[in-house]
Amino acid sequence: MTGMLGAGGWSDGKLVVSTVQGGQLAKYCGEEKAMSLMEEVVANFTRFHPKPDEISCSDPKTEPDFIKPYFDLRMSLVWHIGSNYLHEIAKNWYSFLLDKGVNFHWEKEVVGIHFENNDVRYGDPGCGCRAAHMYYDELIFAVGKSGIDFAQSMSDRYKLPTEPKAVQIGIRFEAPQKYFQKLIDVSYDFKLYQKHDNVSIRSFCTNNNAAYVAVEETYGDISYNGHAKKGKEFENQMTNFGILMEIKGIEDPFAWSRDAVQKLQANGTGLYYSPGYTRTPSLTSEGNRVSTIQTNSLAPISLALGEYFAYIVNFIDNMNAVFEFGNDWGFYAPEVKYLSPEPLVKYEDLSLNDFPNVHFAGDALSARGITVSGAHGIYIAEKLIK
């Protein structure tokens, strides 16, 4: 274990309350219960927030006409926590759990789980030592994005029945906020959406006002995300968001995504493109230049993403028709959401059919947001704590 709260609770800071975004929840417990669980997640973040009055929300109700005919707008309630408060929230939450007697095993690597013996085997990373054993009565298996390959290995080992997931890959787009202000006034975390035959494409995880691009490292490869801080001292009048494709029909989505991401690496980091070098990579919230290699050609991105890159180019062209930002933009590549096939679980407690004391949650159950991940955990806990 090397962290807590996941990417959504450590660097993103936006809680999306929706039964159609962020992963499967309502199919297990129904719409009303799903909304209640997600509201409890919001309440937990509020409870441990050092300045809860700083939390703001966006709740759009109608689509604006000016995005037609190019886009649909996916509307949902979004709570903006402020990424500069997340570390304090995590520390407050962690202290609360310690006071309640929860044990944490830091800097330990789980090397195997034997569901049939209720046995978790773990040790110090890279030491080659004999693994220690921890036995459990109930197990909540809730790996983060960096544990998707481990989740896949467990699924393969036990031949778990699964539901295949689509590839989720694209780029992190960035431009001055002024071009998007009329849409931001409607929806802070706007999600523009297009549907094609086997590909859907959407804007994702929008950040405004004090918006910064974040570098992520997963499996030794660099990808990009974004976050927004709260407070005028952080404002940079920039907007960034992912442009993510959901590609169906690829035989091994995880392997395909890994290969595409590796093709987008250069000198130990990712790529940045701006037409005609109009823009350069932006500064992080710490004042450093975002780690990336600037390229004057779209060819390496096109080579990595193949025929699917045309959907991203079309999406940007359509945005330009609506928001008229000309060449005043850039993007970082790649942005990726690794998803392994979703295990089929019992609806009443998210447990495996053959191992009723093993419950899957979060990324292990193909969640794509901290709100749904947290709701998975609460839903399971309600069943376990009588």
State where each predicted segment sits.
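Residues forming the flavin
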Residues: M1-K14, S18, S56-K386
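Redox-cofactor-proximal catalytic regions of oxidoreductases
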Residues: M1-R47
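Electropositive, gly/pro-rich neighborhoods at or near active sites that engage anionic ligands
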Residues: G22, F48, P52-S56, L244
